[in-house]
Amino acid sequence: MTAKFSPFVQKELKKIYQKDRKLANIIEKQIALFEENPKHPSLRTHKLSGKVSNMWSISITMNIRMAYILLDENIALFIKIGTHDEVYRK
């Protein structure tokens, strides 16, 4: 799976890289794992429901999530990153 990032996610990742290198390293590892196997158990990949039922989510840490949409069967566009509440907010 190829991971792509929306302008919003790119901006947020830049902030994280500047402020929290440890979290940035975790994100890099989780994205690499996602590209290798999007359904790896440690990612806790799941489809969202309700108004965001076209989106999927992976766990970066216990509190940080990244949400994505599938552009096709091999390309995921990450459109949100943040805490559980930030990502799942309507």
State each model region's role.
Residues 2, 11-25, 59-65, 69-90:
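Enriched for short, Lys/Arg-rich terminal
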Residues 18-39:
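A short, compositionally biased N-terminal segment around positions ~18-40 that is enriched
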Residues 29, 50-53, 68-71:
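Short alpha-helical linear motifs
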Residues 32-58:
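A short, surface-exposed loop/turn module that caps and links secondary-structure elements
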